[in-house]
């Protein structure tokens, strides 16, 4: 009798172990970048209390830029230079930004200054910049400077006719595009809707890059959303996408009686349209 029980247990363990190792769930990547960091202590503190996979984009001219860079570095958080760039509108940008008509030397000097402030940045994205990112000459000068410093470029896509990605490729600079703006609108329901859209985009395409800002409703949506992130979505820093790193496999499920897995989570997200409007 004991022999039969031991044999059954042994076979059951072998069976369940085989299923344990033969099945895994695919995951999609979600990268979230918070722009305009360095201005507001309270809101910045809330962002820095979030998982370190949330990347921060620091404006070099912001009063707390150096301090936020140091804090992000100490947390192991990915950092971007949030570079002010000329928009199509007449809105004035911060000091140290990039304007149409600048020479290569001027652009290089501005990038050097920004990197000396945001010292641990691994990349750059544009603050405004609807005119700048559509200008081939300015983008050529910028990508040349970024290539020398081994920085990647995240195009915030504030204008549809941006040439930043095209020029980056020509200059040997890794370039990525923003897919979702979380807070074109500051209304809680709208930000929540955009967060769901980012989840949907990641599932459909394998990865998604969402950009938001340190604002109360954005913070509230992220605090709730990140606590309940579906198991098929992996939150990653921007460096993960820049380096094309593989997702970390989720914990496998032990399938005891069926090879057909139960769902990992109840689907809380639906395909939704994106909000219209030009950000910033």
Swiss-Prot record:
Matching CDD domains: CE4_DAC2 (cd10936)
UniProt-listed InterPro entries: Divergent_DAC (IPR006837), Glyco_hydro/deAcase_b/a-brl (IPR011330)
GO biological process, one term: carbohydrate metabolic process
Superkingdom of the organism of origin: Bacteria
Signal peptide: 1-26
UniProt keywords, alphabetically: Signal
Protein family membership: To E.coli YibQ.
Protein name: Uncharacterized protein HI_0755
Organism: Haemophilus influenzae (strain ATCC 51907 / DSM 11121 / KW20 / Rd)
